[in-house]
């Protein structure tokens, strides 16, 4: 089963690349899809931002089915669907002749993402029964490793004069091979749908708040992840792609710390209050202190507090409300997360269009507002959880 969990975590390693690679290759993709150059000579990358947002749309379309499907027909099927869709996404984006085709493949990528979510999270929580929160954090850990390595891979590909498509193709092939393994590896035994009496999902206010943290926590890091490069340029940072590596190191550190904190007995819900609070303060600092170093510090801190598994802990916290329907609980939080991905990034794309050079700072304010709402939600869950459990 350990091998199974490694094969599953590997899909997230590739997913880490899939989730952030379009953001790193915005100008190349935009040029390939026939974007116009802006007045200052840079490419108009707003169409790429829209395509990235379509990943959220794809997740949204498929999540209502993927959770129940995984709970009912088994995790393996869900994983295989995810892998096939992911391989299609990488190849599709790499060779898409136009934005329209890319948009369609991004939706397929989103579908892949949601089937992996409802396969990997519940399976790893079932393999490591004693530490489900920690098992779930490791999905994030795998993504983190690949997002940390991605800037180096991009540099390597560029140095070797290979096409920007190289990483897409390699990643697509790798996840396909991994899928073949998943097809044959053993999965944990589960009490099948027959024995469990169908519990009707009761969504209490606190459970709803826990689900909505999926929205706010995703917005915090999505906005940062997709808009930090522009902020770095605005603050005259010499190499804005460094922010990405600082961010990954922060996430890395947070996952290890959170795992230790949880083992030591810190409640997940407290992390859901403390981390967003740290993000909120950091975003404020990035807004008021306009110098290049703050972007790197911000990258690390947002990586730590924004992306360091808050979303995964929201999943574990929500799963406590629905012990019999972990797959469905996962998809509820991820639905909230995808709505965030789609709406907030579409809004960010719009701000980027109308805001001109001050757009990156306007996006920081948007991010602060959403993050603040997340803190309030977590406080609400903390106060009401005991009454309902």
Predicted regions mapped to residue ranges:
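Cytoplasmic helix-loop-helix junction between adjacent transmembrane helices
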Residues: 105-141
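Conserved MFS/SLC helix-loop-helix module at the cytosolic interface between two early adjacent transmembrane helices
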Residues: 61-97
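Helix-to-loop junctions at the C-terminal end of transmembrane segments
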Residues: 61-74, 254-267, 352
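Structural signature of the two symmetry-related core transmembrane helices
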Residues: 77-91, 270-285
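Extracytoplasmic gate region of multi-pass secondary transporters
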Residues: 22-23, 203-253
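Intracellular juxtamembrane helix-capping segments at the cytosolic ends
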Residues: 115-128, 308-322
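Helix-loop-helix hairpin linking two adjacent transmembrane segments in secondary transporters
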Residues: 130-131, 135-186
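Extracytoplasmic
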Residues: 3-35, 63, 222-229, 344
């Amino acid at each position: 089963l350990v091998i199974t969990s490694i094969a599953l975590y590997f899909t997230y390693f590739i997913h880490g690349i899939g989730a952030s690679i379009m953001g790193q290759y915005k100008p190349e993709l935009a040029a390939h899809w026939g974007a116009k150059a802006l007045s200052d000579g840079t490419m108009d990358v707003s169409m790429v931002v829209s395509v990235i947002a379509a990943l959220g749309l794809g997740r949204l379309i498929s999540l209502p089915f993927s959770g129940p499907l995984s709970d009912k027909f088994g995790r393996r099927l869900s994983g295989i669907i995810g892998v096939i869709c992911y391989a299609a996404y990488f190849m599709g984006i790499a060779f898409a002749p136009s934005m329209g085709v890319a948009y369609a493949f991004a939706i397929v990528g989103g579908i892949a993402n949601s089937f992996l979510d409802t396969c990997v999270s519940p399976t790893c929580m079932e393999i490591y029964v004693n530490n489900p929160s920690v098992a779930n954090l490791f999905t994030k850990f795998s993504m983190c490793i690949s997002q940390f390595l991605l800037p180096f891979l991009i540099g390597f590909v560029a140095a070797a004069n290979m096409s920007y498509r190289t990483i897409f193709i390699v990643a697509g092939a790798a996840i396909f091979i991994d899928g073949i393994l998943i097809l044959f590896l053993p999965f944990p035994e589960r009490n099948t749908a027959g024995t469990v009496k169908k519990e009707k999902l009761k969504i209490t206010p606190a459970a709803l708040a826990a689900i909505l943290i999926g929205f706010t926590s995703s917005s915090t890091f999505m906005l940062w992840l997709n808009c930090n490069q522009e902020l770095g340029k605005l603050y005259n940072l010499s190499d804005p792609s460094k922010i990405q590596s600082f961010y990954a190191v922060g996430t890395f550190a947070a996952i290890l710390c959170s795992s230790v904190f949880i083992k030591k007995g810190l409640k997940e819900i407290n992390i859901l209050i403390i981390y967003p609070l740290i993000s909120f303060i950091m975003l404020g600092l990035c807004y008021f202190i306009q110098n290049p170093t703050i972007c790197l510090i911000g990258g690390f801190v947002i990586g730590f507090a924004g992306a360091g598994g808050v979303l995964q802990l929201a999943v574990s916290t929500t799963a406590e409300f629905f012990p019999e329907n972990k797959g469905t609980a996962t998809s509820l939080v991820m639905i909230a997360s995808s709505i965030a991905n789609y709406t907030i990034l579409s809004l960010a794309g719009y701000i980027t269009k109308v805001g001109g050079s001050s757009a990156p700072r306007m996006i920081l304010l948007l991010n602060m507002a959403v993050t603040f709402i997340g803190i309030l939600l977590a406080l609400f869950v903390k106060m009401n959880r005991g009454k309902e459990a």
